[in-house]
Amino acid sequence: MAKQEYKQLPKRAEIHSATEQFKDTIKTSLGLDLFKGLGLTIKEFFSPSVTIHYPMEQLPLSPRYRAVHNLQRLLDSGSERCIGCGLCEKICTSNCIRIITHKGEDNRKKIDSYTINLGRCIYCGLCAEVCPELAIVMGNRFENASTQRSQYGSKSEFLTSEQDAKDCSHAEFLGFGFVSPNYNERMQATPLDYVQEPSKEESKKETPTSPEANKGDENV
């Protein structure tokens, strides 16, 4: 075990007279420590301000910011992406998602109710990560204050409007839970494909040999 060595500081001399106390006060007040603190204060006083005037000004949020959820629609037809599989409800650690479904005439699940209790949600993003249809994603709307509890979690609050999906004003989500670009080619490729592809540096180093050089090697 390492031995701890402590450095002993010199003990401050005791002050007995008023003259010594006055000298100590002047030394402490007009010392370098005072001017260092004043210099730092003056430097920060003239530095550019980093304060924003909220709510008139807002900082840009990251695409992977996890705030109030969004329920997506298909951009071509405007239909809901959710298929009612219930994976988001099962994986939710806060037990705040509730889905009620029924079987339709085409033997497919139809969603009757989809609610998220935002008072219990911890915005972990597991529901968006496990969704196979990319139907639920984490949005960037963090201003969700309300005086009524009933406004926290209704489906109409999360669902993207059908008009936004059909007029192409709603783009695909590129944040938390979104698949990486060119994912189809990457999934079909095997590890050997990556090995067989030569890098640019290796292709530059490899120079083709001339036929005359090959003939000379054969004669030898």
Swiss-Prot record:
Top enzyme category: translocase
- Binding residues annotated for [4Fe-4S] cluster 1, in chain numbering: C82, C85, C88, C131
* Main location (coarse class): membrane
Free-text comment on the cofactor? Binds 2 [4Fe-4S] clusters per subunit.
Q: By its UniProt entry, which Pfam families does this protein fall under?
A: Fer4_7
Q: Which cofactor does it need?
A: [4Fe-4S] cluster
Q: Does the keyword Cell membrane apply?
A: yes
Catalytic reactions on record: a quinone + NADH + 5 H(+)(in) = a quinol + NAD(+) + 4 H(+)(out)
Q: Which GO terms describe its molecular function?
A: 4 iron, 4 sulfur cluster binding; iron ion binding; NADH:ubiquinone reductase (non-electrogenic) activity; quinone binding
- Keyword terms of this UniProt record: 4Fe-4S, Cell inner membrane, Cell membrane, Iron, Iron-sulfur, Membrane, Metal-binding, NAD, Quinone, Repeat, Translocase, Ubiquinone
Residues reported in the UniProt entry to bind [4Fe-4S] cluster 2: C92, C121, C124, C127
Q: Where in the cell is it found?
A: Cell inner membrane
What biological process terms from GO does the record include?
aerobic respiration
Where in the numbering of this chain does the 4Fe-4S ferredoxin-type domain appear? 71-102, 112-141
Q: Where is this region: Disordered?
A: 189-220
Q: How does it sit in the membrane?
A: Peripheral membrane protein
Q: Kindly list the GO CC terms recorded for this protein.
A: plasma membrane
Residue spans with biased composition (Basic and acidic residues)?
A: 198-207
For this chain, the family text in UniProt reads:
Belongs to the complex I 23 kDa subunit family.
State what this protein does: NDH-1 shuttles electrons from NADH, via FMN and iron-sulfur (Fe-S) centers, to quinones in the respiratory chain. The immediate electron acceptor for the enzyme in this species is believed to be ubiquinone. Couples the redox reaction to proton translocation (for every two electrons transferred, four hydrogen ions are translocated across the cytoplasmic membrane), and thus conserves the redox energy in a proton gradient.
Q: Per its record, how is this protein called by name?
A: NADH-quinone oxidoreductase subunit I
Its source organism is Helicobacter acinonychis (strain Sheeba)
Q: Which gene encodes it?
A: nuoI
